């Protein structure tokens, strides 16, 4: 226990210690360690926690880390989330982690199934019991935490939560003064009301507050998209091209790019981890609009006066009227 608690501010150190990298006869016998992009993000989290420690030394409160990652297929997203789950549960005893996804099927058969795989390989797997939709401390460990640390364990878990856009309040209610992490898998498919409710999870001044959203970027609208655009001032972001990731078959991705072309939306979404240029209900693609906005126009007093009108129909969009000659 003491050794693992020493990795409280070092997720990479925990991951390297807790799993059997390169050990013969295990699922990781041919894997030397986490992938480069995963290590980069572990470091980002560690750096954020160190910054919070420095803030605490001068009497300032820490802050949540909001992290959005947009990627192509097959980079190891679920594996990375699972490693994070086990680090938080093991090194932040008493913490609460909430995991959700775009569908309950994704949540149950992909995200939480992956957590089960990593839990089975972990050096401290005897600390926790894993079910299809949660991971909680075993009775002996819960008793130890309650007796030695005088800490209630009712909210000490990694819990998979499904959601309903019509009843978002059912998703609310989780709080922790020890540590709070929320993960969105395939975040592009999670509706705005759930994002709104999640913001309330981080009101307690816990020393660990992480909101991790990760997805293939299937839509160029919605809150996941806005993490990289309108709301990018609040989020730390990253794009991951699948072809840059070790341990995957690069030929598969090159075949997709060769078939559709580098700038096709299929290549952007499935390989590059970039948002599609055109949405399903979008007549003019975003790239075309951005190029037009950046284009230098020479005024011609003899040309006809042209009015352009873009009528907003829903959400926070605004109607625009523009005159040009």
List the predicted regions and their residue ranges.
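Phosphate/NTP-binding elements of NTP-utilizing enzymes
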Residues: 1-309, 321-325
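Primarily the active-site beta-strand->alpha-helix module of PP2C/PPM metal-dependent phosphatases
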Residues: 313
């Amino acid at each position: 226990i003491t050794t693992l608690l020493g990795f409280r501010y070092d997720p990479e150190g925990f991951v390297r210690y807790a799993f059997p990298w390169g050990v013969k006869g295990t699922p990781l016998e041919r894997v030397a360690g986490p992938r480069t992009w995963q290590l980069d993000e572990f470091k980002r989290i560690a750096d954020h926690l160190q910054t919070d420690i420095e803030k605490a030394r001068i009497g300032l409160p820490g802050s949540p880390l909001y992290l959005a990652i947009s990627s192509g297929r097959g980079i190891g997203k679920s594996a990375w989330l699972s490693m994070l789950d086990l680090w938080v549960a093991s090194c932040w005893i008493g913490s609460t982690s909430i995991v959700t996804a775009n569908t309950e099927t994704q949540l149950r058969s992909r995200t939480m199934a992956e957590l089960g795989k990593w839990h089975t390989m972990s050096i401290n797997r005897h600390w926790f019991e894993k079910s299809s939709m949660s991971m909680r401390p075993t009775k002996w460990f819960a008793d130890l935490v309650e007796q030695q640390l005088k800490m209630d364990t009712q909210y000490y878990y990694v819990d998979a939560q499904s959601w309903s856009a019509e009843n978002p309040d059912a998703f609310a209610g989780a709080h922790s003064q020890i540590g709070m992490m929320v993960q969105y898998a395939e975040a592009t498919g999670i509706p705005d009301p759930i994002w709104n409710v999640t913001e309330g999870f981080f009101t307690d001044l816990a020393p660990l507050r992480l909101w991790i959203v990760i997805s293939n970027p299937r839509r160029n609208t919605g809150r996941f998209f806005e993490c990289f655009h309108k709301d990018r001032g609040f989020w730390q972001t990253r794009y991951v091209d699948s072809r840059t990731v070790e341990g995957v078959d690069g030929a598969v991705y090159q075949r997709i790019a060769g078939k559709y072309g580098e700038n096709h939306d299929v290549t952007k979404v499935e390989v590059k981890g970039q948002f599609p240029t055109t949405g399903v209900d979008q007549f003019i693609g975003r790239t075309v609009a951005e190029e037009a906005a950046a284009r230098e126009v020479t005024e011609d007093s003899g040309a006809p006066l042209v009015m352009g009108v873009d009528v907003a129909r829903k959400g926070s969009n605004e109607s625009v009227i523009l005159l040009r000659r």
